[in-house]
Curated annotation (Swiss-Prot):
Its EC number is 5.1.1.7. This is Diaminopimelate epimerase. It comes from Helicobacter pylori (strain P12). Catalyzes the stereoinversion of LL-2,6-diaminopimelate (L,L-DAP) to meso-diaminopimelate (meso-DAP), a precursor of L-lysine and an essential component of the bacterial peptidoglycan. Pathway: Amino-acid biosynthesis; L-lysine biosynthesis via DAP pathway; DL-2,6-diaminopimelate from LL-2,6-diaminopimelate: step 1/1.
């Protein structure tokens, strides 16, 4: 089995093709392991589709499936073009969501994640039981639960330095309480937003999360008067340009091809 590794905004993914759907959870855990595998944040299985250029199954590094992953959508878009699966502009199916891809330059990829849904507005009082004394999160008056393909809890702090003082145990507790990824952000100015994301499936801070950046962007737009176009900067410091067009969330940034890996034992074990 051949895997192609791509990176988008600091997230890295292994991408391979299959001609039929099956459960690749164990394979994802094996190949995504940082020490005993090739190492990646997730595994993308590219599958044939009757109605789209292709479709995918996406697995987190712990083997759990996810309906959507923003940065992986840009990576698989470039992979599909480079492997003659799809043209520069194409549409693929991620779970039940149509994702459109536009390759503007050799490694600048724009992805349309589609629409979003505001699930809940959560006052600080509902979250205080998860905070330690003098927690940075105590300063967040309101959290926003937003679905951008997967659910995200978003909160904004007033000091950029507080992003470096977040407590992993608190974020993990929030992640399980709301069954969502956790995003803490700082709005530096009208068009620049910094953020940190604690991601489900990774179960830790991640260098970047595309759907998380989309959720932060939407919350900033709806509740903090951010413009329809902004630059978001995650932990990796690799910025993404997000924009809102006709209620669709578009985001654009660099995708890098890292290399190719071969796992011969998969054929022997009949996993493919």
């Amino acid at each position: 089995m051949v895997f192609y590794k791509y990176s988008g905004s600091g997230n890295d993914f292994l991408i391979t093709q299959s001609f039929k759907k099956k459960d690749f959870s164990n394979l994802a855990k094996q190949v995504c392991h940082r020490h005993e595998g090739f190492g990646a944040d997730g595994l993308v299985i590219v599958l044939p589709s009757k109605d789209y250029d292709y479709e995918w199954d996406f697995y987190n590094s712990d083997g759990s499936k996810a309906g959507m992953c923003g940065n992986a959508s840009r990576c698989v878009g470039l992979f599909a073009y480079q492997h003659a699966i799809a043209p520069k502009e194409h549409v693929f199916l991620a779970g039940k969501r149509e994702i459109s891809i536009c390759i503007e330059e050799p490694n600048i990829i724009e992805s349309n994640l589609g629409n979003y849904k505001i699930l809940d507005t959560i006052p600080n009082l509902r979250c205080k039981k998860f905070f330690t004394n003098n927690s940075v999160l105590e300063n967040i008056l309101t959290f926003y639960l937003i679905d951008t393909g997967v659910p995200h809890l978003v909160g904004f702090v007033k000091n950029k330095e507080w992003l470096n003082s977040l407590n992993t145990l608190e974020l993990r507790a929030l992640r399980h309480a709301f069954n969502a990824n956790i995003n803490i952000a700082f709005i530096e100015n009208e068009e620049t937003i910094f953020l940190q994301t604690y991601e489900r499936g990774v179960e830790d801070f991640t260098l970047a999360c595309g759907t998380g950046m989309a959720a932060v962007f939407i919350a900033a737009r709806l509740f903090y008067n951010a413009p329809k176009k902004a630059t978001l900067i995650p932990k990796s410091n690799e910025s993404l340009e997000l924009s809102l067009k006709n209620d669709g969330i578009f985001y654009k940034g660099i995708v890098r091809y890292i290399g190719m890996s071969v796992l011969g034992s998969v054929f022997e074990n009949g996993c493919f």
